[in-house]
Amino acid sequence: MKILVDENMPYARELFSRLGEVKAVPGRPIPVEELNHADALMVRSVTKVNESLLSGTPINFVGTATAGTDHVDEAWLKQAGIGFSAAPGCNAIAVVEYVFSALLMLAERDGFSLRDRTIGIVGVGNVGSRLQTRLEALGIRTLLCDPPRAARGDEGDFRTLDELVQEADVLTFHTPLYKDGPYKTLHLADETLIRRLKPGAILINACRGPVVDNAALLARLNAGQPLSVVLDVWEGEPDLNVALLEAVDIGTSHIAGYTLEGKARGTTQVFEAYSAFIGREQRVALETLLPAPEFGRITLHGPLDQPTLKRLAHLVYDVRRDDAPLRKVAGIPGEFDKLRKNYLERREWSSLYVMCDDETAAALLCKLGFNAVHHPAH
């Protein structure tokens, strides 16, 4: 059995070699000749999987180590009798921590408290729901918009997008990309919505580039209306609008979900799915794969306030480390993908062991995903 894996999928070689022969290949473009001699294909979001890629090949299973699946023609795979698995939620924590890193940076720069802001979350799936939980743990007001969930009668106080635009100081998008249909998200943030955002609002897109109309966003920024913007995703990736990048506060190369933990979760989820597909079910404990974090443990004295949370969060991951490299190479062909391929190791908050002498601080840090313990001062 031969399994093709994207060369940038961590732990793929060591896991899939338990099941058969493994060949690591580039994800964009996939070498077509390799597909004619393989049984399974494991990809990331850079690989478009459809009839033109796989028709006439012996591939009988496709796994994507990503939560999103808009790069995969699932209907055709089903019709062709090809097994498929994605990794829902694998990088949700990473995206939440990216959003926090950006918000804490903007709050410090502009001198505001997040507790005085209302945060509108558009799309309340794996990412949006975790973001809401952490924000509410900090006492920050959230408004939720998720029409498909509201229509299903899911529990939650779901508002309309209109209400969020009127009330929210921060609007953050965490939807899939649907190009048509009743819940179309293509240009969900269109010219009208962007024009109606409150002066001084913050717009964050860390889901899929075309959810926000990039031309309309640039027009508003060029008009000089106060708006802070954080973009991790762009229309037309890997090409992006360089003028828009120059106008936003934080711009990164579609890496919000790129923690070591998130990538490892993605790989293990598709590995477990494929092992079950071939009747050799296996489970993998994530901690057996991950290396020891850079920071062993730190000690925190006193309560947890916003500046302290910012220091802890940025000790693990400061979003600015990914903003500067993109600005340096923007517009140079191939560089966007190179930043993703050669991405510096990044960990999640859970990798930081925090000893607190304040019991409330320890409990709150645990709710936020840190590995915190109460250790009374003697």
Swiss-Prot record:
Pfam families: 2-Hacid_dh (PF00389), 2-Hacid_dh_C (PF02826), DUF3410 (PF11890). It comes from the Bacteria. Keywords: Cytoplasm, NAD, Oxidoreductase, Pyridoxine biosynthesis. HAMAP family: PdxB. Pathway: Cofactor biosynthesis; pyridoxine 5'-phosphate biosynthesis; pyridoxine 5'-phosphate from D-erythrose 4-phosphate: step 2/5. This is Erythronate-4-phosphate dehydrogenase. Substrate binds at S45, T66, Y258. Its main location: cytoplasm. CDD domains: ErythrP_dh (cd12158). It catalyses: 4-phospho-D-erythronate + NAD(+) = (R)-3-hydroxy-2-oxo-4-phosphooxybutanoate + NADH + H(+). PANTHER family: FORMATE DEHYDROGENASE 1. It comes from Salmonella typhimurium (strain LT2 / SGSC1412 / ATCC 700720). SUPFAM superfamilies: Formate/glycerate dehydrogenase catalytic domain-like, NAD(P)-binding Rossmann-fold domains. Belongs to the D-isomer specific 2-hydroxyacid dehydrogenase family. PdxB subfamily.
